[in-house]
Curated annotation (Swiss-Prot):
PROSITE patterns: BRICHOS (PS50869). The lineage of its organism: Eukaryota, Metazoa, Chordata, Craniata, Vertebrata. Inhibits gastric epithelial cell proliferation. Keywords: Disulfide bond, Glycoprotein, Secreted, Signal. Residues 63-155 form the BRICHOS domain. Expressed in stomach. Present in mucus cells at the base of antral glands, and Brunner glands of the duodenum. Present at lower levels in the mucus neck cell region of the fundus (at protein level). Pfam families: BRICHOS. Residues 1-30 form the signal peptide. Glycans are attached at residue 33. This is Gastrokine-3. Changing residue 171 to G: Impaired secretion.
Length: 191
């Protein structure tokens, strides 16, 4: 067999798998990770959101002058963690799946930011509990990494319509895209 035909056969063997990888893997990767950064309304700063659909995690970096914070929304475990830079503490809470936007909602909203089509805003209030979390590893790597080196506390979602019996100045106001506002209220013990 001439050398030319061997090269052609080898080339065919390489092309077929390359086409399969391109057809199946590339679209899957596109669906797995989505990121975007955009200016915040009414504030100086930006919010960067990264969606990892495969792991079920949304990471948020908000460098607003009014309320700088980082966050993780772990959809597989229904957990929300927020690192509040003004309080130098982390807060961990159970996410109510009915109240939070889905991963698909967030991914679609990231694509619509430039056009200004936003879903309605919802607000939730959480109260910080005095118990400090000792073992962050049990809540997964994204939350452990986010809250490393700062005290971390549990927070409980307030039922809608219940009045807060605490100082409103103790609340940190967070915004997630235009989906929802979160208020995390209460004194952080030891600070």
């Amino acid at each position: 067999m001439p050398l030319h035909s061997l090269e052609r056969d080898n080339m065919r063997r390489l092309i077929a798998p390359s086409i399969l990888v391109t057809v199946f893997l590339v679209p899957a990767l596109a669906l797995t990770n989505t990121s975007d950064s955009y200016p915040l309304d009414g504030s100086v700063g930006t919010q960067t959101i990264h969606v990892d659909a495969l792991r079920g995690v949304v990471s948020i970096r908000d460098n607003s002058v009014q309320s700088e914070w980082d966050g993780v929304m772990d959809y597989k475990n229904d957990l929300l963690a927020a690192k509040l830079f003004s309080k130098m503490a982390c807060v961990l809470a159970k996410m109510d799946p009915a109240a939070f936007p889905s991963l698909d909602d967030i991914t679609q909203a990231l694509g619509k930011q430039a056009s200004g089509h936003y879903p309605p805003t919802r607000g939730l209030t959480y109260t910080v509990l005095p118990s400090r979390i000792k073992n962050l590893a049990q809540y997964g790597v994204p939350i452990k990494d986010l809250c490393r080196a700062v005290p971390t506390y549990f927070a409980r979602q307030q039922k809608e319509g219940t009045a807060l019996t605490m100082d409103p100045d103790s609340c940190s106001e967070l915004q997630l895209l235009s989906f929802m506002g979160l208020s995390i209220c209460g004194e952080i013990p030891g600070l």
